[in-house]
A protein has these predicted regions:
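Short, conserved structural patches
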Residues: 2-10, 57-208
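Glycine-centered recognition micro-motifs in short, flexible terminal segments and loops
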Residues: 9-34
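Acidic side chains
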Residues: 19-20, 44, 61, 207
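Membrane-embedded alpha-helical bundles that form the substrate/pore pathway
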Residues: 24-28, 44, 57
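N-terminal start-of-chain detector that recognizes signal peptides
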Residues: 27-28, 37-38, 170-176
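C-terminal juxtamembrane segment of a hydrophobic transmembrane alpha-helix
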Residues: 29-52
Length: 208
């Protein structure tokens, strides 16, 4: 009789444990994809933020180098790319290489010119895509009391109006970035589009 009671108790215990195990498996199946999304998001956005900081640093340094060179080198546009623009390009290329970022062949690219603005464009190719747009405006005009930041994608001059106009050098660096987070989020039915590039812009007053 005691043995029969023991058997019934064990059988009842197993019946109670099985639903608990099933519930745990369901919870794990639901939480695992969310955990993966969370972890991928942390690493992806951290990498994007780090890249943003690096681009901000190099844009600032490149603008300072060009602004310190004589402005007279942009006076004769028929002589090719001014030395100040080349110096700025070298700063960007060296910084990317030193920080283990692919320069995508930036140093060998021939720029296009519009006025006193030179643009180096390398369309994104490969997996992950490698693409860079570098804009150097040696005659960036803005009002002395301006609180409007420069256009990070064009470096176009501002309109000073009746205010005193200042002239500086504007450098914009735009770097292709492949998000892993978007691919994982798509598994949850999300099709949100994220920026295809990270960019930074800086302005330095021309010194000469």
């Amino acid at each position: 009789m005691i043995r029969a009671a023991y058997v019934r108790t064990c059988s009842l215990g197993r019946q109670l444990v099985r639903p608990d195990r099933a519930a745990q498996l369901v919870e794990f199946a639901v939480s695992l994809p969310l955990l993966v999304l969370f972890v991928v998001g942390i690493f992806d956005f951290s990498a994007a933020f780090t890249l943003k900081q690096k681009l901000t640093n190099v844009a600032r340094d490149a603008a300072r180098v060009a602004a310190a060179d004589p402005s007279a080198d942009v006076g004769n546009l028929s002589s090719g790319v001014p030395s100040s623009v080349i110096d700025s390009l070298k700063v960007v290329d060296s910084y990317l290489t030193a920080n283990r970022l692919n320069d995508c062949g930036l140093s060998t690219k021939t720029p296009t010119r519009s006025g006193v603005t030179w643009t180096y464009t390398i369309a994104p190719t490969g997996t992950p895509p490698c693409g860079i747009t570098l804009i150097i405006n040696r005659g960036y005009v803005f009002p002395v009391t301006s609180t409007t930041p420069p256009d990070a994608r064009t470096c176009l001059s501002q309109t000073p109006g009746s205010q005193t106009a200042l002239v500086g050098t504007c450098v914009s660096v735009q770097y292709a970035y492949a998000w892993k987070f978007a691919r994982v989020a798509s598994l949850f039915g999300r099709n949100d589009s994220l920026p295809t590039e990270i960019f930074a812009v800086a302005v330095a007053l021309n010194e000469n």
